């Protein structure tokens, strides 16, 4: 007889790989708080694109689980981008209120403490003799910029970001993400636990029934024989248009360290389709060093909750951020060549059409899923082989959140694990 009495730990310890998760894991408030600490505050999180803060003093805010982070351009041009908590070191007042802005320095409007763009305390009037300003800088977070994308980590002992960036540099290089700009960015609030949103993204078993707009042009659900034939064609064509072939799957339990998940996988578009558009036609100028279409698209992952879809002419980024036990933000960013001009080189409504309608459908699916797993009579069912990627994610999640004797601290830490 199992001696574990905590229903959450019992569910984690008795879960069987290849099955959906038990319902309690989607609606236990204490578990949700532990997820924030164990997963989100120890992972590398995508917070924005460098083009959002081009000038010295430009900043954006990233908020998660009650924490607000200032991400600021500290030097001009290609200079340093840093991240710090949006909390005054005097009595804790919030420094910045607007989602984006520009400041020559950060001034607390409560008692006037003033900070430089690097977070150092520059001024604090009428403090007693012996007050050491150097000990009261804003708390800095680890921050890295890779391929134009900005990442932060709350953990002081976070895993080396280079584990992610070194693996992904060559595969992403042809797309020139550092030379893109944001054509559109939109948030899709989903009334569900964050795990259901990520699970849904990690499988395409539902694509045929739920996403006809996607399925008409993408080869994720076609028979293996047809898949293999189309893949052979794009593998032959890719070098001719400036694309190299890589296959990376170092995520979840195979990441080598916590919070540096990365993957890169090409797959075929169906014949007659060049991009993720309504009619399969080109949507925007080619990205980076790409000179033509090879008939394929790319799925990639950067960290545990950021995913991307790269076409030859644009990139779509998905970021999932928990906002509460049953609330998740799905933010989508569409990137195009930095030289592209809206109205001349691309039509914004056509550019976003596919993943806008697909995400609206996903929102309905996921919210319906949440309602079902909340039922006291819900029982986890078996997964399809087409949900293998999602199953890898579930195995990692259960291992991360279990409090068993065999669950080592190294798995939860920033350091490497076996």
Describe each PLM feature range.
Residues 52-174:
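Rieske [2Fe-2S] iron-sulfur-binding domain
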Residues 47, 95, 121, 214, ...:
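Short clusters of hydrophobic/aromatic residues that line enzyme substrate/ligand-binding pockets
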Residues 21, 25-64, 69:
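Non-catalytic accessory segments flanking enzyme active sites
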Residues 6-23, 178:
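Short, contiguous pre-domain boundary segments
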Residues 41-54, 122-126, 299-304:
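Short Pro/Gly-enriched beta-strand edge/turn motifs at strand-loop
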Residues 40-44, 93, 206:
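Generic structural signal for secondary-structure transition and capping sites
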Residues 72-76, 80, 86, 144, ...:
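C-terminal catalytic domain of Rieske-type non-heme iron oxygenases
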